[in-house]
């Protein structure tokens, strides 16, 4: 048995996991390969579940926290994992079987469909905020309507700062004002494509459809956690840039 791998690819919007299986003793031929493949799928689903549990929702919570606290989320997440598809498979020379399985982060069959409604239900009501749709690059990219200036989106350049992707990040200014967060989003859009998009560079963020033709590009001052966490999933911009976004 080999060590299996699993990973969340935020830029691609997928979660993948590798699984290995061996046939039971005394089985041969096609029956052995079928049983080895079945075992590999079970192993991949188990690794996928572990990876999904560790996905950061915000600075202080992971998917696992929601699964533990909500039977509805647990049931939805379990169904999504079982619905993952085999995207790569291979019979090994020793008779073992290897598969790679993938599930989407977004869309009606994606992890967001289980998590975003739970985020909404756990978000206290607030006065109607400015409508913002953004893109962050890890750089963060968001689609934001900004004060009639004509910007089609916002790109926050947080490259080299150790930004950790999450489902529900917040953009703050240096005065601690929340510029963008769950209060600003359209939940259907967040399920279909995420609150923000993550890219490896500003140039790749500018190519994202959500950024539009004329995005506002601002440089993050730093990354930060939440009130009770140091997980660097949120970005901080200057007060002036915060005003430009709003």
Mark where each language-model region is.
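Domain-level marker for long, solvent-exposed, non-transmembrane regions
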Residues: 1-246
């Amino acid at each position: 048995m080999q060590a299996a791998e699993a990973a969340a690819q935020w830029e691609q919007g997928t979660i993948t996991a590798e699984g290995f299986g061996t046939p039971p003793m005394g089985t041969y031929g096609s029956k052995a390969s079928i049983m080895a493949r079945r075992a590999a799928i079970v192993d991949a689903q188990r690794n996928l579940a572990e990876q999904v549990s560790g996905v950061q929702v915000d600075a202080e919570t992971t998917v696992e926290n929601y699964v533990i606290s909500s039977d509805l989320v647990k049931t939805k997440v379990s169904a999504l994992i079982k619905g993952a598809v085999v995207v790569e498979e291979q019979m090994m020379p020793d008779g073992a079987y290897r598969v790679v399985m993938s599930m989407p982060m977004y869309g009606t069959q994606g992890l967001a469909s289980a998590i975003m409604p739970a985020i909404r239900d756990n978000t206290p009501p607030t006065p109607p905020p400015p409508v913002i749709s953004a893109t962050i690059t890890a750089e963060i990219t968001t689609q934001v309507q900004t004060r009639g200036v004509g910007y089609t989106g916002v790109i926050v350049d947080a490259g080299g700062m150790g930004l950790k992707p999450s489902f529900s990040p917040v953009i703050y200014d240096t005065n601690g004002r929340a510029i963008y967060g769950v209060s600003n989003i359209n939940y259907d859009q967040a399920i279909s494509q995420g609150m923000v998009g993550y890219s490896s560079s500003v140039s790749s963020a500018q190519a994202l459809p959500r950024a539009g033709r004329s995005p506002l590009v601002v440089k993050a001052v730093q990354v930060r956690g939440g009130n009770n966490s140091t997980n660097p999933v949120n970005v901080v911009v200057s007060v002036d840039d915060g005003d430009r976004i709003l």
